[in-house]
């Protein structure tokens, strides 16, 4: 099953996350199908903090992909 989740990048004490569509059997930071955006929790500017390709996420969800809890919360905040 395809799941849309966060993949951690960045370095120690400076996290940066990519929002990716991947197979749920793959590791968190492993191979993914498509990059759908990013989340930078440290950034102060809103434009550099989060970016989500909502059209692509909607496409994956129509194909049966599930959202992780964290991505679901980020998507809700991004739409506001």
Curated annotation (Swiss-Prot):
One of its GO terms (molecular function) is structural constituent of ribosome. It comes from the Bacteria. It comes from Wigglesworthia glossinidia brevipalpis. This is Small ribosomal subunit protein bS16. GO terms for cellular component: cytoplasm; small ribosomal subunit. Belongs to the bacterial ribosomal protein bS16 family. GO terms for biological process: translation. The lineage of its organism: Bacteria, Pseudomonadati, Pseudomonadota, Gammaproteobacteria, Enterobacterales. The gene is rpsP. InterPro entries: Ribosomal_bS16, Ribosomal_bS16_dom_sf. Keywords: Ribonucleoprotein, Ribosomal protein. PANTHER family: 30S RIBOSOMAL PROTEIN S16, SMALL RIBOSOMAL SUBUNIT PROTEIN BS16M.
